[in-house]
């Protein structure tokens, strides 16, 4: 029974961000099919940030009408909306509309907004629901949340999305002949025709399965989350679960009591490890300057990971080829949840260490941004070393800053519930600032340049 409950909690947590994570890892294929092309990531970044209206409304309801809004019907509603949006996306992802003199993926962008609305709102509804369960299920929930990024990334790796080959194209007036690898000899052409011109173009290879099947898989995963939540609702929680919680974790009970000096001995001492008291004391004694540093780092890190760098990933990776872009998008999505597991085994609460790790991750992000600014001819373009460096840079960027985000959340969680509330506000503020900063740079000022990989000539 306990194993089944852990499984349900894991599947429930997996549904929190599986749809949006799935969209990001599918981008290497989508940018080749949709009219927005290289601009698509910046559009998605802004759309996802606009979807924060959902958690904002839920938070305002809890603030001004406490007790009026129950998480259970909200969770049922958003999971039903998410499943329906994924199903519609499977059939409408490539439907375009003519707007302001050009084709645009209106259906895709609108459905992405609803998926983002679901996933953003899950941040302020899933965790309050988990507070009804015994504390030891919370770790299982976060493992499931990590799988929401890992599973779509693995599926995208199998799919092989966005892979291309270069073909030779010969052109004469009124005639265009294509060959895949060997050029057409001039002896096959009529002597009366002018000399042909040659160049290379990209031809995208068909993935192992289509976006239709990929989005149907996302629909299945979201539907599994809905079923898991329904079954969790039918579990006999209540008083028995509360008693279990108290028996399994007296430290949790101690941590929510007032942190008076006389409180730090009796209840927590028998059950906590020798270092636990010092950890709680250090968390409780955080100075305002330290808290300001933590919130600033939270906002800065999320601005980079959720707003700034995703907007230019195509420009930093595609000049090295579609394989580099495909691996960067998928492996960074794998690295992020794996890095989220590290604090379970290798926790480090030192603000100095987390600051150094933030600088290191920012360095990798700066390299990615520099390559995007130099597009379509970045450093080592056309050399295998450049491909390896850009993939490693994106993976390490995601891993370093994901670890920082988790550890700062752990520090604030141990301080108070209101600290976590302000942490969430810093996350959304940083993400919003990053998205609003990059959208005009990419789509209005057009500071980043795109080009066909096969026709690039960066020798000059």
Swiss-Prot record:
Disulphide bonds in the chain: 377-454
Pfam families membership: SLC52_ribofla_tr (PF06237)
Glycosylation (residues): 94, 168
Membrane topology qualifier: Multi-pass membrane protein
Keywords from the named record: Cell membrane, Disulfide bond, Glycoprotein, Membrane, Phosphoprotein, Transmembrane, Transmembrane helix, Transport
Protein location: Cell membrane
An MF annotation (GO) of this entry: riboflavin transmembrane transporter activity
Gene name of the encoded protein: Slc52a3
Phosphoserine, modified sites: 242, 266
Keyword Cell inner membrane among UniProt keywords: no
Family membership noted in the UniProt record: Belongs to the riboflavin transporter family.
TM annotation in the entry: 7-27, 38-58, 72-92, 106-126, 138-158, 212-232, 292-312, 327-347, 351-371, 388-408, 419-439
PANTHER family named in the record: SOLUTE CARRIER FAMILY 52, SOLUTE CARRIER FAMILY 52, RIBOFLAVIN TRANSPORTER, MEMBER 3
Membrane topology, Extracellular segments: 28-37, 93-105, 159-211, 313-326, 372-387, 440-460
Major localisation: membrane
Keyword Membrane on entry: yes
A GO cellular component entry from the record: plasma membrane
Function comment: Plasma membrane transporter mediating the uptake by cells of the water soluble vitamin B2/riboflavin that plays a key role in biochemical oxidation-reduction reactions of the carbohydrate, lipid, and amino acid metabolism.
Catalytic activity: riboflavin(in) = riboflavin(out)
Taxonomic superkingdom: Eukaryota
Regions of this protein lying in the Cytoplasmic compartment: 1-6, 59-71, 127-137, 233-291, 348-350, 409-418
Protein name: Solute carrier family 52, riboflavin transporter, member 3
InterPro entries the record matches: Riboflavin_transptr
């Amino acid at each position: 029974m306990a194993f089944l409950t852990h499984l349900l909690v894991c599947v429930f947590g997996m549904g929190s961000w599986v749809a949006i994570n799935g969209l990001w890892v599918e981008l290497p294929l989508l940018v080749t099919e949709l009219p927005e092309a290289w601009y698509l990531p910046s559009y998605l970044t802004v759309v996802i940030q606009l979807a924060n209206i959902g958690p904002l409304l839920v938070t305002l309801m809890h603030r001004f009408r406490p007790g009026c809004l129950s998480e259970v019907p909200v969770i049922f509603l958003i999971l039903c909306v998410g499943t329906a949006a994924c199903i519609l996306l499977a059939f409408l992802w490539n439907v375009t509309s003519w707007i302001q003199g050009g084709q645009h993926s209106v259906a895709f962008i609108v459905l992405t907004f609803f998926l983002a609305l679901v996933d953003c709102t899950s941040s302020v509804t899933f965790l309050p629901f988990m507070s009804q369960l015994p504390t030891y299920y919370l770790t299982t929930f976060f493992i499931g949340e990590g799988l929401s990024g890992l599973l779509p990334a693995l599926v995208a790796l199998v799919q092989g999305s966005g892979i291309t080959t270069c073909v030779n194209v010969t052109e004469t007036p009124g005639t265009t002949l294509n060959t895949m690898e060997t050029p057409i000899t001039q002896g096959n052409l009529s002597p009366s025709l002018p000399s042909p011109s040659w160049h290379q173009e990209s031809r995208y290879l068909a993935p192992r399965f289509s976006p239709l099947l990929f989005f149907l898989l996302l629909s299945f995963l979201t539907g599994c989350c809905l079923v898991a939540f329904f079954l969790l609702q039918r579990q006999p929680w209540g008083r028995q679960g509360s008693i279990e919680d108290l028996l399994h974790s007296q430290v949790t009970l101690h941590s929510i009591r007032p942190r008076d000096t006389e409180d730090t001995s009796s209840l927590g001492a028998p059950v906590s490890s020798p270092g636990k008291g010092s950890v709680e004391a250090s968390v409780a004694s955080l100075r305002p300057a330290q808290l300001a540093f933590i919130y600033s780092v939270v906002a800065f890190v999320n601005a980079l990971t959720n707003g700034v760098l995703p907007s230019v990933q195509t420009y930093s990776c595609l000049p090295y080829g579609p394989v580099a872009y495909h691996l960067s998008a998928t492996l960074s999505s794998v690295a992020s949840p794996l890095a989220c597991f590290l604090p379970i085994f290798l926790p480090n609460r030192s603000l100095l260490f987390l600051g150094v790790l933030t600088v290191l991750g920012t360095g990798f992000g700066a390299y990615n941004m520099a390559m995007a600014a130099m597009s379509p001819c970045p450093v080592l373009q056309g050399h295998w070393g450049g491909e390896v460096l850009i993939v490693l840079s994106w993976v390490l960027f995601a891993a370093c800053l994901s670890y920082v985000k988790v550890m700062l959340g752990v520090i604030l969680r141990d301080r108070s519930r209101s600290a976590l509330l302000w942490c969430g506000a810093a996350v959304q503020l940083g993400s919003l600032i990053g998205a609003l900063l990059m959208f005009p740079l990419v789509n209005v000022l057009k500071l980043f340049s795109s080009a066909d990989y096969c026709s690039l000539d960066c020798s000059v």
